[in-house]
Amino acid sequence: MLLGKDVDEVLERHLDIGGNLFKGIRHAGSWDSSNMINNSHHNPPKDMYLMKEFGEGLKILSGKGLVFEAWQYHHQLLQVAHLASNNPDLIIVLDHFSGPLGIGSYATIKEQVYKNWKKDLKELSQYKNVFAKLGGLAMPINGLGFEANPNPPT
């Protein structure tokens, strides 16, 4: 999406190759200033979802009827609300319920994290073009400690 308007050519190529099997893209924007918390695999810039080029790319994606999967941390939820507000025809899937962090500096303020997460999820829920994917809430970044158990939590 950071290609802005130039993403059209890339999406067209995907549509040509994938046909009706190509439904959309996931562009992970999870970013935190702490060196104890990993950013997304491609190390996105801070506030990537608010960048002009990203918004231009989403307009192209939306115009093609494709889906956008958003993966970011809890403190970035309102950036997704910004995307939803500016792209009412774009279907947005909120991956991993926006990863509430529970490690690093967040480990000692979990109650505040969950309070803010709940408030921001409620704000986001007003947008009928946003859907949430339930999963990924037992990752080590959530700080629940499931990774220390001998067996998975489910």
Mark where each language-model region is:
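Short, well-ordered, mixed-charge alpha-helical segments that flank or form enzyme active sites
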Residues: 5-8, 32-36, 78-79
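Catalytic pocket-lining loop regions of alpha/beta-barrel enzymes
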Residues: 43-154
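A metal-dependent hydrolase metal-coordination microenvironment
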Residues: 1-13
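Gly/Ser-rich oxyanion-binding loop with an adjacent helix/lid
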Residues: 16
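Glycine-rich phosphate-binding "P-loop"
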Residues: 27-48
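Divalent metal-dependent hydrolysis catalytic cores, especially in the metallo-beta-lactamase
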Residues: 1, 23-30, 66-68
